[in-house]
Design a protein with these regions (language model features):
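A short, surface-exposed alpha-helical micro-motif characterized by mixed small hydrophobic
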Residues: 215-217
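C-terminal boundary and immediately downstream tail of ABC-type ATPase nucleotide-binding domains
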Residues: 1-10, 138, 241-274
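ABC ATPase "signature
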Residues: 233-234
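Catalytic Walker B motif of ABC-type/P-loop ATPase nucleotide-binding domains
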Residues: 173-176
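Conserved catalytic motifs of ABC-family nucleotide-binding domains
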Residues: 169
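Conserved ABC ATPase signature
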Residues: 148-152, 156
């Protein structure tokens, strides 16, 4: 009896089930206050779900728990309570392109590294995947593959970080402040690279940032964090135009109280009722 190729069915099921579930997650760290040991809660009862195709942004001021939450989602640290379920492959781009790349590895070796966690890939396929990832971030493999990170600019290093994240063809791309250490011109270039990759690969995006403009330009849905808690969640138009929490109102007002800002982020400002 001959069986039909069911690859298309398998891929369809995968696309429908790829998701990240964060359920009632809490995380504490040891600290010292007034000379006494104490526990500080970095993440406070956080729950959300990212489905296939979602573009999520987690925004908030520095120290609100965003990066800790991202590290929990990635499995780099364990929550003290709560559950994180991950269905699908995850690529990660760290905040610091200078610290996140091994100084003694070439660009090709760095980008190739995640492939060793997948099932066996032959040499020619490995080269193809690495070259495709480098081309996707506009780094010519012939020019850059054998360079060390010390021979790259900050923008080029972050492109290598992105190439390393996408070489496995991830279902989810998690990015922690991916442009915070780059100047404005390079930041825009990286935005454009990320946007094209997310659309082309049809992967979901989880972006951790305090850059309100970036979250508006890159994400469809926003979670607002304050002191480890999610204080507001919704579509970006809702969060920008109809805030329910005082902290969100303060955060958005501070960011948008600049001439031309609404045009910059591509969102129509709601009319203020007299």
């Amino acid at each position: 009896m001959k069986y039909k190729d069911l690859t298309h069915i398998t891929n369809f099921i995968k696309e429908q089930t790829a998701r990240i579930e964060v359920i009632s997650v809490n995380k504490y760290f040891n600290s010292i206050f007034a000379g006494k040991k104490c526990k500080v809660q970095a993440v406070n009862n956080v729950s959300f779900q990212i489905n296939r195709g979602d573009k999520f942004g987690i925004i908030g001021t520095s120290g609100c728990g965003k990066t800790t939450l991202a590290r929990i989602v990635l499995g780099l640290i364990k929550p003290d309570s709560g559950i994180v379920n991950k269905y699908g492959k995850i690529g990660f781009v760290a905040q610091d392109p200078y610290a996140s790349l091994s100084p003694n590895m070439t660009v090709r070796e760095i980008v190739r590294e995640p492939l060793r966690f997948l099932s066996k890939i032959n040499k020619s396929k490995e080269i193809e995947l690495v070259d495709n990832a480098l081309n996707a971030v506009h780094l010519n493999p012939l020019k850059y593959a054998d360079r060390l990170p010390s021979k790259l600019s900050g923008g080029e290093r972050q492109r290598v970080s992105i190439a390393r994240a996408i070489v496995i063809r991830p279902d989810f791309l998690v990015m922690d402040e991916p442009t915070s250490m780059l100047d404005e011109a390079v930041k825009k270039e990286i935005f454009d690279v990320i946007r094209v990759i997310v659309e082309k690969e049809q992967c979901s995006l989880l972006m951790i940032t305090h850059d309100i403009a970036m979250s508006a330009n890159m994400c469809d849905k926003l979670l607002v964090m304050e002191n480890g808690c999610i204080v507001e969640a919704g579509d970006k138009e809702q969060v920008f135009n109809n805030q329910q929490h005082p902290f969100t109102k303060k955060l958005i007002l501070a960011a948008t109280d600049i001439e031309g800002y609404w045009e910059k982020i591509g969102i129509t400002k709601a009319e203020t009722k007299e």
